[in-house]
Amino acid sequence: MTRNERIFHAVLFELMALAIIVPAAALITGKGSSDLALVGIGLSLYTVVWNYIYNLYFDKWFGSNRADRSLAMRLGHTVGFEGGLIFISIPVIAWFLEITFLRALMLEAGFLVFFLFYATGFNWLYDKVQPFGKMRKLLV
């Protein structure tokens, strides 16, 4: 994956996730969508940077042929990625939403379950469809 494709991939991933998670979190927590959107955007920016670094090294260690990765490797990839997010997201969620650490942990657990399936499905579909290459061909 080129640097531009990595950025495209990360931004597309985050935008689609925010479109799903912000309304769902507003329903679950009773917090305003604007507060949740601010938290979501802040964590998404952090996530985009983490995504770029994590996937750059993951591809170096496990090969860059993403289309042939097994389900087990995809699940391992997702678990490792999400683990790196937990250490930042729980304190940020608790502080910004003014909730207890335990409630932030429970909310993060829900996000983790969502993203385990979302990331696995998104990355599988992205690798099969390869939208960046198709968009480049259309624009060139």
From Swiss-Prot:
Any keyword Zinc? no
Tell me one GO molecular function of this protein: antiporter activity
GO-annotated cellular components: plasma membrane
List keywords of the entry alphabetically. Antiport, Cell inner membrane, Cell membrane, Membrane, Transmembrane, Transmembrane helix, Transport
Q: Which domain of life is it from?
A: Bacteria
User: Mostly located where?
Assistant: membrane
Q: How does it sit in the membrane?
A: Multi-pass membrane protein
Covalent S-S links between cysteines? none
> Which regions span the lipid bilayer?
7-27, 36-56, 79-99, 105-125
Its localization reads: Cell inner membrane
Keyword hit for Thylakoid: no
The record's section on InterPro entries has: BTP_bacteria
Q: Which NCBIfam families match?
A: PACE_transport (NF033664)
Assigned protein family: Belongs to the proteobacterial antimicrobial compound efflux (PACE) (TC 2.A.117) family.
Role according to the record = Mediates the efflux of short-chain diamines when energized by an electrochemical gradient. Confers resistance to chlorhexidine, benzalkonium, proflavine and acriflavine. Mediates efflux of both proflavine and acriflavine via an energy-dependent mechanism.
Name of the protein in its database record: Short-chain diamines transporter
Record organism: Vibrio parahaemolyticus serotype O3:K6 (strain RIMD 2210633)
